[in-house]
C-alpha cells in the first residue's frame, strides 16, 4: 500500500465492476492523471482479472488502452492504466443521435485497426460493445475492456457463451462451437449499425424474441444509408459465419477506403521499445538511470520507471499542443508539475549559451512517433526543452557547472516565438552572454535608458566585491557570483 501511495495520489472512483474498482489517481512525479484498477486478491476473481492484465501487457497499439504499471501488495493488485479523457461510444452516439457516414468512418476504421491487431496476436475480444469503446476529445478511439477476451489458435473453436446478448452472433446463441474472430466481425457490424442509425439492429421485449431475431438475421436498414454502407453492414452481419469476412478483408471494403484510405499508423506504439534521449536525459536529473529506463521499456517490465517514462512523454506531447498562456506562472508555486499549474514563461525568451539545449520544434512540421513529419501552413516555432529539473539555489552562469536539484522535478512548457529569426537579429546587437548578465525573468528584459543604466550599474557592482548588489532574487532563486 505504501509503495502505491508513494507514487500515486488516489482520487475519486470512476468505475465499478463486479469484483474490482477503477479509481482516478494522480501520478505524483508528473501530475498526470491515470486510471487504476484495484483487484482484491481473491483466488478466483483475481485469476480472471490478472488474465486481462496479461493480455494488456501484450498489446501496444494506439487504439487499445495502455497498461503502464503493475503494483502488487499483500491484499491487492493495482493496474495503472492510461486515462481516456472523453466519453464512451454509447454516450457519444446518445448525444449526437447518430453519426453521418463521414463522421462514423474514421472512428470505425480505428476499431478495425485495433481488432485486426488483436486477431493477428491470436486474441479475440468477444465483448466489443459501445460501452467498452472510448472516444477521446481528439477523436481517437480506445478499446478499454478485455475482460472476456481469450487466446485462440488458427482454426480453434470455442464453446463458452459470453458477451452482451444484443451484440452476440447467431452461432453463439445457438450454443454451437464458434470461431472467435468471426464473432468479433459480427459484433463490429452491430456497432457500425448503432453508430449510423442511433439504435441497435436487434431489440425485443424478451430474451427469446431477441434470440429469434438475431438467429434469423433480420433487421431494417434506412434508405438514407449509401449503397456501399448497406452492403458493408449486411456483409458484417452475415448469419453464416463461414461466409462472414475477416477483419483484414473488411479493411479494404469500398466504404472503408472511400476518401482517405489511411488507417492508424501501425508504428505509433504507445510504449516504445527504444527510449527517446530527449526524455531520458531529464529523467536522469531526477534520479532515474538511463540503462534502467532502456531495460524497462525493452523488456516491458511495467514498473515505476516504465510508467514514469510513458507519463512524462504523454505530458510533453500534451504541452506541445497546449496554447501558450497569456500570463507567466511562478515556478516556485507548485513543487510538482500538474495539469492545473504548469510553469510557463513569457513569449520571446532568449536562450543563452549556458541554458540546457532543448528540442526545437516548428509548428509548421508535425513530428510523428515514427520520425516522419508533415507540413502545415503556420510559421511559428516552439522551444521544447523537454523535462528539466528546476534549479533552486543557482542560476545558470557562464563557464560554471550547473547545479540541479533532484528533489523538485519540473516540466517546463513550450515557449513560443512568433518570429524565429527575430531572436538572432535582436541578439546580434548585444554583447555576448556573460556572468555579469542579468538572469532572464518572466517579466522580460529592461527597456529604455533607465533599464540599461540599472543593468550596467548592477554589473559594475558585481565587479567590485565590496559593493553589494541591489538586485533582489526572483522566483525563489538566488544569484550565483561568477568564479574568479
Swiss-Prot record:
Xref: CDD domains: STKc_AMPK-like, UBA_MARK_Par1
InterPro entries found in the cross-reference section: Kinase-like_dom_sf, Prot_kinase_dom, Tyr_kinase_AS
Record keywords: ATP-binding, Kinase, Nucleotide-binding, Serine/threonine-protein kinase, Transferase, Tyrosine-protein kinase
UBA domain sequence ranges: 274-314
Pfam families: Pkinase
Annotated stretches, region: Disordered: 423-447
Broadest EC class assigned to this enzyme: transferase
UniProt-annotated catalytic positions: 127
Binding of ATP, residues: 14-22, 37
Residues of the Protein kinase domain: 8-256
Reactions catalysed: L-seryl-[protein] + ATP = O-phospho-L-seryl-[protein] + ADP + H(+); L-threonyl-[protein] + ATP = O-phospho-L-threonyl-[protein] + ADP + H(+)
Sequence ranges of Polar residues compositional bias: 423-434
GO molecular function, one term: protein tyrosine kinase activity
Tissue: Testis-specific. Expressed in the testis from 22 days postpartum (22 dpp).
EC number(s) per entry: 2.7.11.1
Miscellaneous comment as given in the Swiss-Prot or TrEMBL entry: Tw12 allele. Encoded on the T-complex, a region of 20-30 Mb on proximal third of mouse chromosome 17. Naturally occurring variant forms of the T-complex, known as complete t-haplotypes, are found in wild mouse populations. The t-haplotypes contain at least four nonoverlapping inversions that suppress recombination with the wild-type chromosome, and lock into strong linkage disequilibrium loci affecting normal transmission of the chromosome, male gametogenesis and embryonic development.
Biological role: May play a role in sperm motility, especially in the regulation of flagellar function.
Family: Belongs to the protein kinase superfamily. Tyr protein kinase family. Smok subfamily.
PANTHER family associated with the record: MAP/MICROTUBULE AFFINITY-REGULATING KINASE (PTHR24346), SPERM MOTILITY KINASE 3A (PTHR24346:SF95)
Protein name: Sperm motility kinase 1
Species of origin: Mus musculus (Mouse)
Species lineage: Eukaryota, Metazoa, Chordata, Craniata, Vertebrata
Amino acid at each position: 500500500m505504501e509503495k502505491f501511495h508513494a507514487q500515486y495520489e488516489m482520487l475519486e472512483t470512476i468505475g465499478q465492476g463486479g469484483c474490482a474498482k477503477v479509481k482516478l489517481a494522480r501520478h505524483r512525479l508528473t501530475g498526470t492523471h491515470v486510471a487504476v484498477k484495484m483487484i482484491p486478491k481473491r483466488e478466483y476473481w483475481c485469476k480472471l482479472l490478472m488474465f486481462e492484465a496479461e493480455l494488456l501487457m501484450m498489446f501496444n497499439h494506439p487504439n487499445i488502452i495502455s497498461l503502464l504499471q503493475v503494483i502488487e501488495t499483500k491484499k491487492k493488485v493495482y493496474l495503472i492504466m492510461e486515462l481516456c479523457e472523453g466519453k464512451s461510444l454509447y454516450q457519444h452516439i446518445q448525444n449526437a443521435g447518430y453519426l453521418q457516414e463521414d463522421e462514423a468512418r474514421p472512428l470505425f476504421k480505428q476499431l478495425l485497426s485495433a481488432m485486426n491487431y488483436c486477431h493477428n496476436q491470436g486474441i479475440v475480444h468477444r465483448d466489443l460493445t459501445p460501452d467498452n469503446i472510448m472516444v477521446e476529445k481528439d477523436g481517437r478511439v480506445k478499446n478499454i475492456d478485455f475482460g472476456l477476451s481469450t487466446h485462440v489458435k488458427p482454426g480453434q473453436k470455442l464453446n463458452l457463451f459470453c458477451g452482451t446478448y444484443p451484440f452476440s452472433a447467431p452461432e453463439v446463441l445457438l450454443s454451437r462451437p464458434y470461431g472467435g474472430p468471426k464473432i468479433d466481425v459480427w459484433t463490429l457490424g452491430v456497432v457500425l449499425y448503432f453508430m449510423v442509425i442511433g439504435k441497435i439492429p436487434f431489440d425485443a421485449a424478451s430474451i427469446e424474441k431477441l434470440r429469434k431475431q438475431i438467429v434469423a438475421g433480420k433487421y431494417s436498414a434506412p434508405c438514407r444509408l449509401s449503397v456501399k454502407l448497406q452492403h458493408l453492414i449486411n456483409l458484417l452481419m452475415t448469419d453464416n459465419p463461414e461466409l462472414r469476412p475477416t477483419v483484414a478483408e473488411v479493411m479494404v471494403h469500398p466504404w472503408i477506403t472511400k476518401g482517405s484510405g489511411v488507417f492508424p499508423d501501425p508504428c505509433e506504439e504507445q510504449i516504445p521499445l527504444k527510449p527517446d534521449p530527449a526524455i531520458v536525459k531529464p529523467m536522469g536529473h531526477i534520479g532515474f538511470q538511463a540503462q534502467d529506463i532502456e531495460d524497462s521499456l525493452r523488456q516491458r517490465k511495467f514498473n515505476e520507471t516504465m510508467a514514469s517514462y510513458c507519463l512524462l512523454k504523454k505530458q510533453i506531447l500534451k504541452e506541445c499542443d497546449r496554447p501558450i498562456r497569456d500570463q507567466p506562472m511562478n515556478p516556485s508555486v507548485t513543487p510538482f508539475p500538474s495539469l492545473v499549474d504548469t510553469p510557463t514563461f513569457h513569449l520571446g525568451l532568449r536562450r543563452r549559451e549556458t541554458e540546457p539545449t532543448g528540442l526545437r520544434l516548428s509548428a509548421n512540421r508535425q513530428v510523428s512517433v515514427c520520425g516522419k513529419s508533415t507540413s502545415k501552413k503556420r510559421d511559428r516555432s516552439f522551444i521544447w526543452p523537454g523535462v528539466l529539473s528546476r534549479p533552486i539555489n543557482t542560476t545558470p552562469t557562464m563557464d560554471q557547472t550547473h547545479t540541479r536539484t533532484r528533489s523538485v522535478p519540473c516540466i517546463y512548457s513550450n515557449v513560443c516565438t512568433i518570429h524565429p529569426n527575430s531572436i538572432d537579429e535582436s541578439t546580434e546587437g548585444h554583447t555576448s552572454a556573460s556572468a555579469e548578465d542579468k538572469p532572464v525573468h518572466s517579466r522580460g528584459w529592461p527597456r529604455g535608458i533607465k533599464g540599461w543604466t540599472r543593468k550596467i550599474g548592477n554589473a559594475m557592482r558585481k565587479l567590485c566585491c565590496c559593493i553589494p548588489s541591489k538586485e533582489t532574487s526572483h522566483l525563489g532563486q538566488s544569484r550565483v557570483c561568477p568564479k574568479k
